[in-house]
Amino acid sequence: MSYLCSGQQKQRMSTPIIHLEEIRKSYFMGKHELPVLKGLSLDIFKNEYVALMGPSGSGKSTLMNIIGCLDTPTAGRYVLNNNDVSEMHDDALAEVRNKEIGFVFQQFNLLPRLTAAENVALPLVYAGMKKKERIEKAMQMLELVKLSDRSHHRPNELSGGQCQRVAIARALVNDPSLILADEPTGNLDSKTSTEIMEIFEEIYQNGNTIVVVTHEEDIANHSRRIVRLRDGVIETDKLNPLFSKAPVLS
């Protein structure tokens, strides 16, 4: 059974932004089946801030790939913002990814020859926006993450924390339905990690939906809700008692 935060029931209406129903994922080695996700069901609603946790082998990375439309389930149903993506082919999945999801990765995934502003603007190239409008929107996002003064710097001229700020700005630039962050502070020191998670809190308070995949308790404690996986199923799904900040909902 998926968790429903009683304090936000009225705002969420009845349709989750992420609906996972009896999701199964197996990998096959010859005739041998290796089940990773074993009938997992989960609902995540608009304006939620959720951390996915679990030990190595729990299935959290596989679940992240399915949520991010980077992989498809072996069985079950996945609906993302009213789009049933369970059986979509690669081209359709790519279109959904570009439109609905903003990714933040541990390794930043910035193009080394592009400036910070050009990296942020990349999703808008695929969306067909004109160059002047792309750069204007990219600068707005860099301002949001407090990095507009580094807009002309390339990744090798930025610190790890600054690169991750660029990655967050890029994730936001296309106004996605979902921000999906995979170990976003894994390559950062503790002080910079805290600064990055404070940015995620600001994004959440602005009304964005965020899912963070992490194995670190201190990172998960920045989220409102913590879902713990073990052996391919949800072990617990609870509100985080340490979280007190509410989003500003329109």
Regions found by a protein language model. Give the residues of each.
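Conserved beta-strand-loop-alpha-helix hinge in the C-terminal portion
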Residues: V233-S250
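Cationic, low-complexity basic patches in intrinsically disordered or flexible, solvent-exposed regions
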Residues: Q9
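ABC family nucleotide-binding domain
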Residues: P16-L229
